[in-house]
Amino acid sequence: MTEKQQIKMVVFDWAGTTTDFGSQAPVDVFDRTFRQKGLVFTKAEINAPMGMEKKAHIKTMLSTEKGRKLWEDAYSRSWNEDDIEDVYQCFEGNLRTVVAEYSKLIPGVRETVEKLREMGLKIGSITGYTSEMMQYVLPVAKEQGYEPDCCVTPDVTEYSRPTPFMVFECMRQLNVYPPKLVVKAGDTVMDILEGKNAGAWSVGIIKGSNVVGLNEAEYNALDEQAKKELHEKARKIYLDAGADYVIEDITELPEVIAKINESL
């Protein structure tokens, strides 16, 4: 008799999922970088491609009608690939100075990961940050009690979300297969698409997410009705992207995994 299959691994995103409540670091640094180049985008416009590799994020924003116009107004010409590289290098420099400051764990992460490990699961992690950027984040997370079994970045796989290759690399490093025994948990549409493209289970987390986009103080200042409205909006965004499950809080994840295990 074959043993019943169970989920073997959870792959977490970083900013907005396990650290940096509201995914504030990339938003703030993108805003600072674009302003240094004479370009002003709204927070919503910066958030729209969030979850992509950062150079691809910059190119996506500058490829919009507004992005092209802002660039042409500032420089009297269209942008080129050298310009994308220049903006990216500026972004990296800005992020390097602040990323560790934004690496506080989101409430419930440490306890949830401990419970998942007790359930026998491996913990993978992936991010839109580069390996160099993560050198500043990983030690700060470890000091707070969070140390995933692996951390995969876009420069390792050469491709970022929504491709599945960072999930596949976690599977390779931790010897986990097939994809249906993997849960991808994140806080952006790109996270959901990445999980689906990998053939894994995709779970969207609302509290602390980029989709909600508020820092911890802003979120906690909301009344219950305002929180409920934001949660419903975020839930719809995740479900429209194809999420298998949407949870309000990361602490609900072990229960979701138990439900998935029952269905396998």
Question: What is each of the regions a protein language model found here?
Answer:
Residues 1-8, 110, 114, 118, ...:
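Asp-based, Mg2+/Mn2+-dependent phosphohydrolase catalytic module
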Residues 4-110, 114-119, 135:
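N-terminal helical cap/lid subdomain that shapes the substrate entry/recognition surface
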